[in-house]
Amino acid sequence: MKTNKILATALVAFTMMIGTSSFAQKEKTVMVGGAAMYPSKNIVENAMNSKDHTTLVAAVKAAGLVETLQGKGPFTVFAPTNAAFNKLPKGTVETLLKPENKAMLQSVLTYHVVAGKMNSADIAKAIKAGNGKATLTTVQGGKLTAWMQGKDLYISDENGGKAKVTIADVNQSNGVIHVVDGVVTPKK
């Protein structure tokens, strides 16, 4: 009887181990900033692991948007890299991170977020339906324009600024991230 209990316990443990292992193998990851992005983690959890998004993470924290971007969503986030933030005029990031500029920072960050999950195929379909351009309404309320140049996907803001999607379709538990090489800004 004791042997049967031990065997049953071992069988249950082995089954759970195999189940967990096969889940980890089925989870398709994408490398961003030297770290694996796991579809079972949310936008903030994954962004915090990317060495290419430390400025974005600091900005999300300063803007008080961590809880929002950890929420259910789904969200489509066009995530600027550190290099994208470095392209801004000198002192811009430091100014935006000041507590007195929290509302402005929130506006810039939420301008990079679209409600719903739009992978690159969804965006390409919208571009085709829009005769070469798609208008995306951001959580901030402004508009982004998406278009293709060859096989590359771009977004542009209402001021003429643009960003190229360098890594598309980084799936998250609460949406999708598209890594971009520029910071887009809402209408001035």
Task: Please name every model-derived segment.
Residues M1-E27:
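Bacterial Sec-dependent N-terminal signal peptides
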Residues N4, F23-K188:
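Mature, structured domains of secreted/extracytosolic soluble proteins
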